[in-house]
Amino acid sequence: MRVKVILACTECKQRNYNTMKNKKNNPNRLEIKKYCPFCNKHTVHKQTK
């Protein structure tokens, strides 16, 4: 089952990205290193509630 998730920057807490996640393959919270336009650098983005 694929669900829509929101990714937030760990440094500035801005919610920058929306993505899809397969709950069966990834039951834990998603963590991806992506570009944050507010920090102007690549940071770790975590899945929000």
From Swiss-Prot:
Keywords: Ribonucleoprotein, Ribosomal protein. InterPro entries: Ribosomal_bL33, Ribosomal_bL33_CS, Ribosomal_bL33_sf, Ribosomal_zn-bd. Pfam families: Ribosomal_L33. One of its GO terms (molecular function) is structural constituent of ribosome. The keyword Ribosomal protein applies. Signal peptide: none annotated. The keyword Ribosomal protein applies. GO terms for cellular component: cytoplasm; ribonucleoprotein complex; ribosome. GO terms for biological process: translation. SUPFAM superfamilies: Zn-binding ribosomal proteins. Belongs to the bacterial ribosomal protein bL33 family. NCBIfam families: PRK00504.1 (NF001764), PRK00595.1 (NF001860), rpmG_bact (TIGR01023). This is Large ribosomal subunit protein bL33. The gene is rpmG.
